[in-house]
Amino acid sequence: MASLTDLVNLDLSDCTDKIIAEYIWVGGSGIDLRSKARTVKGPITDPSQLPKWNYDGSSTGQAPGEDSEVILYPQAIFKDPFRKGNNILVMCDCYTPQGEPIPSNKRYKAATVFSHPDVAAEVPWYGIEQEYTLLQKDLSWPLGWPVGGYPGPQGPYYCAAGADKAFGRDVVDAHYKACLYAGINISGINGEVMPGQWEFQVGPSVGISAGDEIWVARYILERITEMAGIVLSLDPKPIKGDWNGAGAHTNYSTKSMREAGGYEVIKEAIEKLGRRHREHIAAYGEGNERRLTGRHETADINTFKWGVANRGASIRVGRDTEKEGKGYFEDRRPASNMDPYVVTGMIADTTILWKGN
């Protein structure tokens, strides 16, 4: 008799041309992820081959009960690391039945920015460092921390190994491999300064694909922590006191920045970002004021400053970029719970399209 595990891992490829497509979308809070699956004829190689779908928006905080239908538009596809085979994960955005983007659809505006000829010509690259915290289920307390107590002070945990310093590595490595399998351009992982906190990096990714890849990487991480009985937190300051917060540092460059003379373009872009500091901060994640205090490798939320190799700055420029006179810079302001569509689109808009008026 087949076990549950046998059935979960059942390979359908030799008995049907149908596949399972898991449609994923961002829920009403702007940070929660929802998904549901449907059967389609495979193989699917492009999202345009997939049908639109709908869901009950009144149950996700995205539509009233008397007119609850929200339409899913498939936008990007990835291999499904859970069902494997030809099965796929589908990143969608959300519209009214009349074809208007709903308020929580932040992808639509970002796609408009990235499709602008001036932005497309600059081929914007993003590398996003997604920090997160693993929590003990039912306790809302970091993994590896004594119940009701605290571990030793920060210092031994960053990029560390050992049962007393690294907590949750099996989840981290499972996520790393699952993202590679899915086709996400995940570029690395590391343990963070606060115990129980980790980071993965996605990129370089071009334009709108950076947001798609971060959202699907988050979805995969949610599924893996679900399987492990661990809770994923993207709170930018999960523990009060002398503990690091969690951010989503966003590395960015344009074609002009990557070419000879690019350092001057970088400085001009940073100057523009400084002039729109308040607008960016307002869009860079909920609760970020608890993280951006001027301590724990952050700049104060009300102050904009940049520097070379300065992790206490709003914008950090690397030593190699300064030396070579071209390259990229890092926006250190985004919180771990930021919407990558908002952040990437806003950076491109400010640095390329905005004329500074």
Curated annotation (Swiss-Prot):
Enzyme class: ligase
Tissue expression per record: Found mainly in the cortical tissues of seedling roots, stem and seedling shoot.
Catalytic reactions on record: L-glutamate + NH4(+) + ATP = L-glutamine + ADP + phosphate + H(+)
PROSITE patterns (alphabetical): GLNA_1, GLNA_ATP, GS_BETA_GRASP, GS_CATALYTIC
Domain GS beta-grasp, first and last residues per copy: 19-99
One GO CC term, this protein: cytoplasm
Record has ATP-binding as a keyword: yes
SMART domains: Gln-synt_C (SM01230)
Broad class of the protein's primary localization: cytoplasm
Domain of life: Eukaryota
Swiss-Prot/TrEMBL keywords: ATP-binding, Cytoplasm, Ligase, Nucleotide-binding
Residue intervals of the GS catalytic domain: 106-357
GO biological process, alphabetically ordered: glutamine biosynthetic process
Subcellular location: Cytoplasm
Matches recorded under Pfam families: Gln-synt_C (PF00120), Gln-synt_N (PF03951)
Gene Ontology MF term list: ATP binding; glutamine synthetase activity
Record-listed E.C. numbers: 6.3.1.2
Family label: Belongs to the glutamine synthetase family.
Function: Plays a role in the flow of nitrogen into nitrogenous organic compounds.
Subunit record text: Homooctamer.
Name by which UniProt lists this protein: Glutamine synthetase root isozyme 5
Species of the source: Zea mays (Maize)
